[in-house]
Amino acid sequence: MKILHFVAMISLLIFSSGAFAYRCVIDMRKIDEALSKQPAITEAQAQEVRKLRAEGEVLHNKGKHKESVEALHKALEILGVRQ
């Protein structure tokens, strides 16, 4: 029974990291789309969004998907985009 629990836990970890990886790409696309529509935010906010989006992409490419999603969600929050 312990082996079954262990296998289930490992499977969950493997699949959840893949879900984060996919989430990054979706969030980056949402940010790009929102920025292309010239949202009603200040230039300082737009710069912060671009910075967070770039940071999220770098983290994604390094395989740090949880951190990437966190940065991207901050950008989406500034843009007022639902996640």
Briefly describe each language-model feature range:
Residues M1-V7:
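Bacterial N-terminal signal peptides that target proteins for export
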Residues S16-G18:
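N-terminal signal peptide c-region/cleavage motif recognized by signal peptidases
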